[in-house]
Amino acid sequence: MVSKILMYGLPSAAVAVGTALLNEDNRNTIFRKAFAFTQNHTPKSFDEHFPRGEWDKNWDFRDPTSLVDKSKWEKADEVGKKKLLEECKATASRNIFLIRHGQYHLDREQKHLTELGREQAELLGKRLANSDIKFTNMTMSTMTRATETANIILKHLPGDLPKSSSSLIEEGPPYPPVPDHKTWRPLDPEFYTEAARIESAFRKLIHRAPPSQKEDSYELIVCHANVIRYFICRALQFPPEGWLRMSLGNCSITWLVIRPKGHVSIRSVGDIGHLTPNKISFT
């Protein structure tokens, strides 16, 4: 029996041990490759594990090199060119508060605010009034539910606050979403035309401050969920097809900050802290 064990058992055991060691070596090799960047901090090995896209610093075409007068630039010497660039540099930040309208009647043509929607707007207006922020201006969508929301908010803010209306920020499909929505699918022509309008609104409203602006601004834009979500993606240089993955409550606040050099950050997305649980809706 012992001789049989020696004859057959030992080779089998050796194979098992050898296989285990081989598997262990393979695992170690895999782990070494997976965590190689912890041992080697060269840019190549690090970036292989963390591929990153480039930030477009001139995303709004308001970098000084885009604003400078080309005819003056061609005639200027090095000192003159430096001066021209300095004159085109932004020095202030823009704080943009993207406000979604209150709850509205889905089954009515004009889609007026519901009683709850009006309460939401009142609570939002009080919060903005008590925020100690001196708002610079307000732009509102021309759609009924947004205009009604804006007018309720304005009752709580200084009467001399500059305000304007824009049809560019009306609701619409900004970009074909990924993944597709199960039940909502506008026709291709609607995407084609409405996406162009909403992109036009983004280019007009979302950009760094002009060189002439010397103080930080605090601007209110009262509009719609699709528009706001698209603006977020575009401003942060996220894929625009991801806009539908976010959900914004009625009368929520999304606070966008654009710095002088074009850097963008989000202070809050869909903030509804001014609403009690029984006042929250997402229609």
UniProtKB/Swiss-Prot annotation:
Lineage top rank: taxon: Eukaryota
Transmembrane segment boundaries: 7-23
InterPro entries, per the entry: His_Pase_superF_clade-1 (IPR013078), His_PPase_superfam (IPR029033), Mito_Ser/Thr_phosphatase (IPR051021)
Membrane topology: Single-pass membrane protein
Keywords: Hydrolase, Membrane, Mitochondrion, Mitochondrion outer membrane, Transmembrane, Transmembrane helix
GO biological processes: positive regulation of mitochondrial fission; protein dephosphorylation
GO CC annotation terms, alphabetical: mitochondrial outer membrane; mitochondrion
Enzyme Commission number(s) of this protein: 3.1.3.16
Reactions mediated catalytically: O-phospho-L-seryl-[protein] + H2O = L-seryl-[protein] + phosphate; O-phospho-L-threonyl-[protein] + H2O = L-threonyl-[protein] + phosphate
Function statement: Displays phosphatase activity for serine/threonine residues. Has apparently no phosphoglycerate mutase activity.
Subunit structure: Interacts with skn-1.
Family to which this protein belongs: Belongs to the phosphoglycerate mutase family. BPG-dependent PGAM subfamily.
PANTHER family cross-referenced by the UniProt entry: PHOSPHOGLYCERATE MUTASE-RELATED, SERINE_THREONINE-PROTEIN PHOSPHATASE PGAM5, MITOCHONDRIAL
Name this polypeptide is given: Serine/threonine-protein phosphatase Pgam5, mitochondrial
Underlying gene: pgam-5
